[in-house]
């Protein structure tokens, strides 16, 4: 069947027609190498409609098809998706998707470069020898995968449109048009038509006007910052469109107030009039080289009548075995069956702020397991639900979107602000894992790539000792402190000096906390700050006796661990005993804390007191015993 090139296609594209789906011939293919501005190679085609020819840049997602020979000099192709941008006064066609109709053909017609003068037009050619290259244009297209399965027809005769024989009819692909809710909605500037809706993959900084239709898949909290310009606030949300393209949108200051409550995860929006800037890959894990920054003229409009064609979420799951070779700080998606969940524990950050941490373990069909660390609200919201499920002997499937790889003491995955957790999700990967686990996977041995976890969630780096071993093995008497974990019961708490008066003044963003004394003016004096205060703080300095089946010893618990043991602030107990003089109530609180068993992580170090050397044991972490995890740990010891 003869095939004809689409007449006047180059002219139509220059005039803004992006829905034509024309048949054109490839006259030249040239690879443009990498440079400092480009992160990867690009290809430039010379395409012709038989009369006019025009250079076109090919999006990087088509690189593999160019390298495999699907497109070559002389090929007849159909442009499926493309844009025409104005760059420095020159028109630039960017081909986002195309298909080969005929693999090879002689040059059709006598084409000339579009827009040349009559004199230049006399320089017709057969091939591309006399075609001057356009000005160099540099930009990067985001990497997006497109699947094209149609094989090109074979043995097709090719001719120019001047021949009256029947012509091949191009296939019609769905075009991107503004939805009905967008047309005639809101104020539009005079002589300004609504921007054409394009795929996220087609976005680049060289476009004047654009619009995208996409679903919000994730939304961050409002973050506040302070820099040389003053205080500010920012939030971001992630978008996913019909073609699987993803991009992050960021708003600052007044735009936070304008758009934060407007955007909602799961809803579809029409977004236009933002600026594109290079994505900050330290904070942005999406597979897109650009990021949208909304401006005062930007619009974000809800599409209430969306048809569900845009997926709810997009995953790119990695098997746990692959995570073992992933680089530190890699952002990835992982799915597995939860085998254990540890209790949530408070953690003091370097800035003095407290957060929570919860550790769980995942396994999958790859024969590997990995430790997952939940931080902050993930501990309470999702972590508690997972813990209840596992404690009731049900092991849920957990999908993690945008987890961060850590290589500290083996490989593990942790949550970040943009992480999303999906418990027992309804998609094929989850159903497959569920079936695998229920029909044999549960009893299949899995090697942990975290290396610091053992059955029951116990740390491999955790050194378990009993009380008698501390003295017998001379722990703490070397140059470096020893760190051990003891399962012991609190048998006695000294109450004569259970706390000390602490400095409440701030040094930077941290409280001083050094001991203060009464001055001559009856105020509190801090030698470190060299300042006086009207009030002081009260912080724990608990002397606690612990014992197990091998013996007993004394340990010291400071503020955070002291509060964990006593269950209330030191200031409350001080006021009860010394100010309110409620001795019996105070004694009852202390008695209530005795004879409870804990997992105590201790720092053991020899220190000098005058001329005497003493081994001091300080509590750095207090956990209630998780009997489910502890039973698994003890069973593992028996097996070994």
UniProtKB/Swiss-Prot annotation:
- Observed effect of gene inactivation: There are differing accounts of the mutant phenotypes. According to an early study with a limited number of progeny from different sources, it is embryonic lethal when homozygous. However, a more recent study describes homozygous lines that show normal vegetative growth, but reduced fertility and meiotic defects.
Q: Is the keyword Zinc-finger in the record?
A: yes
Swiss-Prot/TrEMBL keywords: DNA damage, DNA recombination, DNA repair, DNA replication, DNA-binding, Metal-binding, Nucleus, Zinc, Zinc-finger
One Gene Ontology cellular component annotation held by this UniProt entry: nucleus
**Localization, UniProt:** Nucleus
**Tissue specificity comment:** Expressed in roots, leaves, stalks and flower buds.
Per its UniProt record, what InterPro entries does this chain match? Answer: Euk_RPA1_DBD_C, NA-bd_OB-fold, NA-bd_OB_tRNA, Rep_factor-A_C, Rep_factor-A_N, REPA_OB_2, Rfa1
Any one GO MF term held by the record is: DNA binding
Q: Which residues mediate DNA binding here?
A: 211-293
Q: What induces it?
A: By the genotoxic agents methyl methanesulfonate (MMS) and bleomycin.
Entry's Gene3D superfamilies?
Nucleic acid-binding proteins
Checking NCBIfam families in the record gives: rpa1
Please give the family membership noted in the entry. Belongs to the replication factor A protein 1 family.
Assembly and binders: Heterotrimer of RPA1, RPA2 and RPA3 (canonical replication protein A complex). Interacts with RPA2A.
Name used for this protein in its record: Replication protein A 70 kDa DNA-binding subunit A
